[in-house]
């Protein structure tokens, strides 16, 4: 993923589905997943390029085909039917070239299955934390 100036990056769109697909993960779950994946220290679980999309999401660049495979993979990992806040971009989609990279933009895009269990778990914990925080606030008001 070649780096460019911020002004040029705002105008440049990256075509998904050929060299990579993109998995959009809510932030901070994406940052937490990235730290865990790097912390494993295992080449098979090494993330590829990861970018920040504003303050709301992390973009994990993965091998093409992830968009098509995501629903079945989530089902296989027992996360099917749970709204984790994930979105995949693939063939026919374009995204603005990221301005902020959290992990090596030149790294090869891994297969999504290598990362998905960790990402899904982090998203689930994010949802549980939000629910816990809401319940705690409601209890303190009541």
State what each model feature region is.
Residues 59-97:
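A contiguous pocket-lining binding segment that forms or flanks enzyme active sites
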Residues 1-55, 64-68, 79, 102-142:
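Signature for HUH/AEP ssDNA processing cores
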